[in-house]
Every structure is written in structure tokens, then in C-alpha cells.
């Protein structure tokens, strides 16, 4: 039998068989992607990450939406720009040094306009333009924005709040300052119907909604720090108000009304600092700094309280942390306590991070944006974020420029991304009622 020659020849090896197989991004182990890659990517870049492949899209939902991250992820305004914030602290139980990571990066998407305040609710951010001419609702996870103009001409004293009703319809409350600066009228914008409406409501107390630290959203409703009418306060012999009853007021986005007065866990004095924050959209937190009764007793204590339960008409409290500021008196480290002291808390590490200006010393020629990190057992660490520019405007008559500074304002709750669509509907024009 005649044997074929091809059977005797060795099989040829192709050059492509010798080359190693290429590994694509989607071939990386899920654990590596989740723990080493996603934890280092800014929230504002997640849209591009999700489009990489189906696996990465699923991992972002599981790790970020599933609350797997152990870090604080949030947003803040600093020097009229929106910045993302990433914070992680691991306190050592032994004599080794604590490890801390505080990263602040400017968001390029919103660079087209100066932003004065940012409010957070349910994974959405409400950013207010510095001149109050418009606001933008932004979903950082989806990369979507909706620009909204006010129903009527804006005032510099106008303020806003973001929330949602029982059906998860997201709404914006606008508080319009009238000629009487202590009196506001109220309007509401519905994102689903793309329309404004006037509300006939009156809160049971005086608020200062224009103060960037007094309104915080929890479970879809916004809570404000408020006090009784100034005319009913306790007055000293010089005619100055020395005491007012203070409390919380809730705006319920389902009923679109203000609720009953809710008690605070302390009674604050006129000169005390009270600011609100929240924990993962579920709990309200409050900072209370009593500076002392005398000028030589400025450095006393800072208390942090967290709600154990909260509803529009009921609340209960538990003390989270007390910081004794007196040992820091000689170092010059203290809160500015004018317009600052926005904060968030880390329940796992039992620390509070307060953003403010550094305590001013006469020997210094500049002010600094500062993060004050405080915790148990006297732990206190100030971290300088950068020089705070003087935003004072020159006097038209004399040209004198006053020294005016604006502290960084942080969104209080850990940011948990949302799948809520906020894209503007092109076919339906904005309506005013």
C-alpha cells in the first residue's frame, strides 16, 4: 500500500499559536476589579466604567449600590466649585500609626457655573448657582443633569431643599425670601411633571433656610433647625435677646406641609453653633458646640448626636461623640464657628469629620480650609485642605476690600448612587402654576 507523504511530515506550528493569549479588561477576576479598581475610581467616572462590559456594570451595582464600600464617598463645595470627597480612616488598636486617606477632587462637569451649595437626597445632588439664577439636579452615577430655572425672579436670599414623596416622586422645595427677610413664601417643583406650584404653608417657628447648614434630607423629608419667634424670646436689661427655644421642623414632601416641633437633645444658647448632618439618608445627626459663657472659656466641648428613630412628627436621640476642646486652646486649633462646621460621621471608626476654616490667629496672614477629624480617647487631627481666598468685594466709595471667607460645605451623608433618571424631557416645556 502506498503511504501518503503528508502522514510522515511533522505538523507545522503557526506563529499565532506561540503568542500568549491576550487578557481583556473583562477577564480580570471580579474580586480584583471590586477591591483594587472600583474603590479607586471617582464616582463621577462610574458611567464610563459601567460601559466597559456587562461584568463591570454588574460589579458597580453590587459594590456601590449594594453599600459594600467601607469609605465615605460624598461631595462638597469649596471656592464655589463642586468636589468629590473620599475618606477612609483605620485606627490602629496597637501603637502603630493610624492610616488615613482624605482625597478631594474637583468635578469638571459643573465647571461652567459657580456653585454655592449642594444638597443630597437619594443619590441625587441639587446644586445651587452662586447667583441663585438656576439650580441643577445631577445624578453622578448615571452622569445625567437637569437645569432648572426658578418660577419667579430669584433673590440672593432664596434657598432650596430636595426630597421625595411616598411614591418616590422627587421634588424641590424653594423658599423665596420676601422684603421682610424673616418671612418666606414657598414653591415646589415636581421632577416628574416638570412644573412649579405655589404652596400655602406656614412653618410653626422661625427658620433661616438660607443658612447652608440648617436643612438636611433624611428618608425623603427635609429637617430644619428652627427657633421660636424672636418677639417671644428672653431679653436682657439692654434689650438684647439672650434665649430662644430651639427645635427641628420637618417638611414632609408627601403632604407638602411642615410638621410639629421636634425636640433637640440639648438647649442651645444664642452664641452656640448648631449644624445638621445625616447618616446614609436614614438618620439625622447634629453638631452642638457650646463656646462657654465667658470670653476666656471659649474652648469647651463639641457634642455629636444621632437619631435612633426619626419621622416627620417624632424623634429620639443618642449621643455619638463628645470632644473636649480645652486641651487644644494653646495650639490655636479651633472651629471658626461663623458659617462653617458642616460635617459627616464614620460610625465604624467612631469619628466625626468637620469642615471649616482654621481658627484665626492674629499672627497669620491667611486663612485655610481645614478638615477637623475627632474621635474617641482624645483623638483630634486637623488636616489643611488649602488656602481660603478672600471673597470680599471692594467698597464702591472707598475701594476698601473687607476680609470675607467662605468655608467648605460638605454634603452630609455618605453618597449611595441612584438609578433615578433626571434627564430633561425635551418635548415638554417647563410649566408654572
Curated annotation (Swiss-Prot):
Keywords: Kelch repeat, Repeat. Pfam families: FBA_1. The keyword Repeat applies. Residues 23-71 form the F-box domain. Kelch repeats lie at residues 170-216, 286-337. The keyword Repeat applies. This is F-box/kelch-repeat protein At1g24800. It comes from Arabidopsis thaliana (Mouse-ear cress). The lineage of its organism: Eukaryota, Viridiplantae, Streptophyta, Embryophyta, Tracheophyta.
